[in-house]
Structures are given as structure tokens and as C-alpha cells.
């Protein structure tokens, strides 16, 4: 039996183009404009005009929806940090299998997709080793079969297709240009570690604000509570490997293993197999995991990122009920 779909107390738009739009606000029908199809506009540009609008309508249309999303997702079921190929794959898999869960994605960049807009060295083609082509079949991305691996003609085709599918789920919200600055914790002492914690949410801020804490003062953050976090922030960098570096500074991990040199043959298997809940409430996947375990990097091949995301979603489904019960205590 499939789980019930997530429900939100937000009115659905009563007008539009007939396509299924997610949790929109009620809007008024257009006051003018008689064209019923694009074909009626073509070759008739002399009489063309847009429907009337005031600038305040645009402001309200954006802010009303955004702040409703902030309110709705302040208590989420799962937060995914990072919307690269691993995070997007995790979101797709999780939203597909558990439509009852509210999933918030937090991405520091303006453009989601991470490094998956291009292949290696800014080339266009994207390579995935088999059996990652099964995920491409799932989302409908064409490829050329090269035997043991497949090639997507342009990485942007994969990323844009996956992103459009993720954003069309009614239970997923992407907060891009938003950085995770910290993790929310709760005491979870064990017999071996009386100072152990579980992760219970994320601390967020606008990315542009996060980048200027050194030259501006008193810019406090916001928060999202969730019983389970999936962190896919990539290898070490300005925003990369954020969650695992924070675990070290909180003394929840002894130290990072440090990503090793490039070895495609060992790296991809290691990343997928080791994708797991590192501490209670925090699942780590993708290249961020290489910094924990000291795994090799795989370079310009993307199959491990995709299948690590799939496994992260599977791990999340496996522990979510337990983490939710703990979160409700």
C-alpha cells in the first residue's frame, strides 16, 4: 500500500494553464487578453500587448508564496543539504517513494546542479558507468551506450531533466541561494559517549549574508527543524563537506579521513556502498562522504553521485520512523 501524499494547508490556484501546479495561492483570472494559444499571437505582433499589471502585484506574488513556503517547511520531514547530482537524485527517489514526507532542499548556489552542468574540464558530455544508466532510464534521459558505460550528450540535459522532475513534486521545496550555517542538535548520550548528539535540523541564512559575516555584524540566521538530514555538499571547499566538518568541530567525529587521489575504479563503489547515517539524524552521501572515510575521488564520472543519492534516500526511509519518534519526544 502506498503511503498517503503530504498535505498542506495552502489554497490551490483556481486558474492557470491546466497543468498541475504545486501549492499555489488563489489568483484572479486575467482581466484582459483574448488569445487562446501561442499560434494566435504569432504573425500578429502589431496588435500584441501583455495583460495589465502593477509592480506591487509582482512583489506580492513572489513574497506571499515564498513566505508561505518558509512557514510550511519550518517543520520539515527531511532536509537535503546541497542540490547537486547526489542531492537531486536523493530528492527524486525519496519524493517518489514517500509522497507523504515534506522535503526541503537547501542549496547555497543560485543555480542548483552543483558540478553536473558539465562533464570533465568544462566539456559537455557526461559519463556514467553501468548500472547507473538505470536511473537515466527512470527519468527519461537519452544516452549512447559504450559497453561498460553510457554517455549523455550534454550534462545539462541530465541535470535540467532531473531538476524539473524534482521541482514538480508537490512535497519538495528548493531554497536556493540559501546556505546552511550550522546544525540543530539534541542530546543523545550513549554509554560510550555521554556527549553524543543527534541532528534535529539545520540553521540557514542567505548565501550572500553568509559570505559577509567577516565584514558585517549581527546577521543572525533562521532554522528548519527536521528529524532527518541528508547532507550532500561535496568535497572540501568554501561550502563543501560542511556537515562533516561541523561534526568534527562539535567533537561528534574524531577527524576527517581526507579525500584521496583520483581512482575511478575504487572510488565509485566505495562512495555508494558507504553512503549511510554517520551520526543519528544525519545521512551523508556523495563526495562529502569521501572526506569522512578517506575515499578516492572519481573525477568526471557521475554514476556514483546518482546511486549514492538513491541509497541515501533508501537509508532515510529505513530510519525515518525512528528519528521521527525521537524528534517528537
UniProtKB/Swiss-Prot annotation:
Transmembrane segments: none
Localization per Swiss-Prot or TrEMBL: Cytoplasm; Nucleus
Record's keyword annotation contains Cell inner membrane: no
Pfam family for this entry, one: Thi4
Cofactor(s) listed: Fe cation
Record keywords, A-Z: Cytoplasm, Iron, Metal-binding, NAD, Nucleus, Thiamine biosynthesis, Transferase
InterPro entries: FAD/NAD-bd_sf, Sti35, Thi4_fam
A molecular function GO annotation: ferrous iron binding
EC number(s) per entry: 2.4.2.60
Cofactor note: Binds 1 Fe cation per subunit.
GO biological process entries: mitochondrial genome maintenance; thiamine biosynthetic process; thiazole biosynthetic process
Record-linked NCBIfam families: sulfide-dependent adenosine diphosphate thiazole synthase
HAMAP family per the UniProt record, alphabetical: THI4
Subunit record text: Homooctamer.
Described function: Involved in biosynthesis of the thiamine precursor thiazole. Catalyzes the conversion of NAD and glycine to adenosine diphosphate 5-(2-hydroxyethyl)-4-methylthiazole-2-carboxylic acid (ADT), an adenylated thiazole intermediate. The reaction includes an iron-dependent sulfide transfer from a conserved cysteine residue of the protein to a thiazole intermediate. The enzyme can only undergo a single turnover, which suggests it is a suicide enzyme. May have additional roles in adaptation to various stress conditions and in DNA damage tolerance.
Annotated PANTHER family: THIAMINE THIAZOLE SYNTHASE (PTHR43422:SF3)
The protein's name in its UniProt record: Thiamine thiazole synthase
